[in-house]
Amino acid sequence: MVMVLSPLLLVFILGLGLTPVAPAQDDYRYIHFLTQHYDAKPKGRNDEYCFNMMKNRRLTRPCKDRNTFIHGNKNDIKAICEDRNGQPYRGDLRISKSEFQITICKHKGGSSRPPCRYGATEDSRVIVVGCENGLPVHFDESFITPRH
């Protein structure tokens, strides 16, 4: 009986090693955050950019009123969730210590169904994000920092 169980047990244990580990829920939320708000190196930051990005990222069913795209390095954005580039801000939110290049896309009105028309505003701002397990998962807002 032990001889029969040993090969079965061995196959079971080997099978566990081959089973892919599913990404954590936090990873999905982080990926969703990147899909909605991250564009490393934008090509132009005008109304056409907003039209294409909102459409390609599937943020137009219905037309989203406003969306902000953050440009730059993902690691700098992740660092907002740590003390390297972020600090506590209102509850569980974090505010960046450095500014990021951003593009704000605002729906110009009209129908809430595609094709959606957007106006673009480009700027450099500090940003506020919500973090879970060291990863940004929610974009809250951005601020223009005072120039000295």
Curated annotation (Swiss-Prot):
Q: Which PROSITE patterns match?
A: RNASE_PANCREATIC
Q: What is the protein's name according to its record?
A: Angiogenin-1
Motif Nucleolar localization signal per UniProt: ranges = 55-59
Q: Which GO BP terms, alphabetically?
A: actin filament polymerization; angiogenesis; antibacterial humoral response; antimicrobial humoral immune response mediated by antimicrobial peptide; cell differentiation; defense response to Gram-positive bacterium; innate immune response; negative regulation of smooth muscle cell proliferation
The record ties this protein, via PANTHER family, to: ANGIOGENIN, RIBONUCLEASE
**Chief location:** secreted
Kindly list the positions annotated as binding tRNA: 45, 105, 127
First-tier enzyme category under EC:
hydrolase
Annotated signal sequence is: 1-23
Coiled-coil ranges per the record?
none
Identify the keywords attached in UniProt to this record, alphabetized.
Angiogenesis, Cytoplasm, Developmental protein, Differentiation, Disulfide bond, DNA-binding, Endonuclease, Hydrolase, Nuclease, Nucleus, Protein synthesis inhibitor, Secreted, Signal, Stress response
Q: Which organism is it from?
A: Bos taurus
Q: Name one Pfam family in it.
A: RnaseA
For this record, an example GO cellular component is: basement membrane
Covalent S-S links between cysteines: 50-105, 63-116, 81-131
Record GO terms (molecular function) = actin binding; copper ion binding; DNA binding; endonuclease activity; heparin binding; RNA nuclease activity; signaling receptor binding
Domain of life of the native organism: Eukaryota
The record's subcellular location field reads:
Secreted; Nucleus; Nucleus, Nucleolus; Cytoplasm, Stress granule
